[in-house]
């Protein structure tokens, strides 16, 4: 019966669903998953208390949808293989990957509450973290690892691949995660489109140089092995 109460037409339904999702993001970010209530979310959204149950099933699935909403939208907006041909080089793939990741973290359209929720999830993990890592983070890490392995060579050690991939990932996310600190240490550091473009170029060049050096060093070590 509540379906008729909250679903007047498809356009109104879509608007209500979006308002509930946005409100949930703000409430979960402010209070955390455990303390937030469905009533608080619906009141903030200006929606019927039954809206969460209708659109998402329950509070837990709403929370999962909130966590996934931003990464899913960013993956569409900034694909990690955007513009690459089927025969793109590993160097080209790395540059596009870094471009994609930096633009995702600095996307002006990214809601402020998303970073807060992710930070909370790292401190107070819920069951949603495992699925988020498996469905969002793991594919990104695997893709980067595959690029790194190509650049290091087929015989590269798994540990080298892992260390290098995490180093590249760390460079990309540090500028965002430590933004408040960096603003005080380096007030001249900005994050406009042209600034992000320079970061993409720097991280790409820096990482490629390091990977080339490591590949040469490992090859030399292999040649010295009796």
Identify the residue ranges that each predicted region occupies.
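N-terminal intrinsically disordered/low-complexity leader segments
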Residues: 1-15, 216-226
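Short hydrophobic clusters on alpha-helical segments that form packing/core surfaces
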Residues: 20-28, 168, 207
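Hydrophobic alpha-helical connector segments
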Residues: 79-114, 161-168
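Amphipathic alpha-helical packing segments from all-alpha helical-bundle domains
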Residues: 92, 126-152, 201-205
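Hydrophobic alpha-helical bundle segments that form small-molecule/ligand-binding pockets
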Residues: 138-162, 185, 189, 211-218
């Amino acid at each position: 019966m509540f379906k008729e109460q909250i679903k007047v037409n498809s356009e109104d339904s879509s608007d209500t669903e979006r308002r509930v999702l946005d409100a949930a993001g703000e409430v979960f970010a402010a209070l955390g998953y455990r303390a937030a209530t469905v009533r608080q979310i619906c009141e903030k959204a200006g929606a019927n208390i039954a809206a969460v149950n209708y659109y998402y099933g329950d509070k837990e699935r709403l929370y999962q949808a909130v966590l996934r909403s931003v990464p899913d939208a960013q993956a569409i907006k900034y694909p990690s293989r955007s513009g690459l041909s089927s025969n793109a080089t590993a160097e080209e793939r790395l540059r596009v990957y870094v471009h994609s990741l930096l633009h995702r973290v600095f996307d002006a359209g990214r809601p402020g509450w998303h970073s807060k929720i992710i930070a909370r999830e790292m401190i107070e993990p819920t069951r949603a973290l495992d699925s988020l890592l498996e469905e969002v983070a793991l594919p990104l890490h695997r893709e980067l690892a595959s690029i790194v392995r190509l650049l290091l060579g087929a015989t590269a050690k798994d540990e080298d691949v892992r260390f290098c991939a995490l180093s590249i990932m760390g460079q990309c996310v540090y500028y965002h995660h430590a933004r408040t600190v960096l603003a005080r240490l380096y007030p001249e550091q900005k994050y406009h489109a042209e600034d992000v473009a320079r970061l993409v170029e720097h991280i790409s060049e820096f990482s490629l140089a390091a990977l080339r050096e490591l590949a040469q060093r490992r090859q030399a070590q292999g040649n010295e092995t009796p």
